[in-house]
Amino acid sequence: TLLGPARTQIRAKVPVIAVSAVRTGCGKSQTARYLSGLLKRKGKRVAVIRHPMPYGDLARQAVQRFATRADLDAAACTVEEREEYEPHLACGNVVFAGVDYQRIVAAAEAEADLILWDGGNNDFPFVRPDLHIVLVDPLRPGHETSHHPGEAVLRMADVVIVAKSDAAKAEDVRRVAEAAQA
């Protein structure tokens, strides 16, 4: 039996906004950083939880907290991890990651009024969102309904953002918007 998010997501004690996408490269992390800025300007303490990247010593990486580049150095983060974490740090965000999801959520809750899930690899959030924002990409029309888990993520969305609409053909923007409404 393959368990889905309804049975596996962790419930947080603080509100959670999840930002996901139907495919990698949709602009999810940029959107998450934009939202974190809006929330912080409204006086909210935001903790970012980044989709885990289980490279290396998983026991040592059970719960990770990054507030500075020195934290990344101390954790011997990979190039791939740095590419995801450094832009958040540059925005003043504290990033939590790792593989012990329950402890990660508890650590983030202790520091924040709100958790912002910055998903990765077009996967489900491991923490249950109160608001789930999903990006679709009109430069790749049809991918929102032809790839897993992207299509399932789209079906879970509370809000859909058609990203890159300024660079796409109007017909492709219409097509992905219609797919999102179906």
Question: Which residue stretches match the model-derived regions?
Answer:
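Conserved glycine(s) of the Walker
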Residues: C26-G27
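Short, well-ordered turn and helix-capping elements at secondary-structure junctions
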Residues: G4-A6, R23, N121
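Flexible phosphate-sensing "switch/lid" loops adjacent to ATP/NTP-binding sites
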Residues: I17-A21, Q30-R33, G37-Q181
